């Protein structure tokens, strides 16, 4: 396996018009994210209740930190659940 690397086996990223790969932060000004704005924060949380990675959401590192802090504050204030809705 002289020419093979682990990168050759990856699936290509599909970017369709269905909106699945659209970053939620592109339509939201991340500078105004507040822990009280639960509707906006839910765009950055998975069904299991985890904060989505910045490579999935398409935000910068600084914006990801703001989002993570806002989500954690909202969880502490019982505006968002710690765990998702379940299976």
UniProtKB/Swiss-Prot annotation:
Binds as a heterodimer with protein bS6 to the central domain of the 16S rRNA, where it helps stabilize the platform of the 30S subunit. Belongs to the bacterial ribosomal protein bS18 family. InterPro entries: Ribosomal_bS18 (IPR001648), Ribosomal_bS18_CS (IPR018275), Ribosomal_bS18_sf (IPR036870). Residues 1-24 are annotated as: Disordered. One of its GO terms (molecular function) is structural constituent of ribosome. It comes from the Bacteria. This is Small ribosomal subunit protein bS18. Residues 1-20 have a biased composition (Basic and acidic residues). Pfam families: Ribosomal_S18. The gene is rpsR. Part of the 30S ribosomal subunit. Forms a tight heterodimer with protein bS6. The keyword RNA-binding applies. Gene3D superfamilies: Ribosomal protein S18 (4.10.640.10). GO terms for biological process: translation. Coiled coil: none annotated. The keyword Ubl conjugation does not apply. NCBIfam families: S18. HAMAP family: Ribosomal_bS18.
């Amino acid at each position: 396996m002289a020419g093979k690397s682990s990168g050759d086996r990856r699936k290509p990223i599909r970017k369709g018009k269905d909106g699945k790969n659209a970053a939620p932060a592109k339509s939201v000004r991340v500078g105004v994210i507040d822990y009280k704005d639960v509707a906006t924060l839910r765009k950055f949380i998975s069904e299991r209740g985890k904060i989505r990675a910045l490579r999935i959401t398409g935000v910068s590192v600084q914006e990801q930190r703001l989002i993570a802090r806002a989500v954690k504050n909202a969880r502490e204030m019982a505006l968002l659940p710690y765990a998702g809705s379940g299976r």
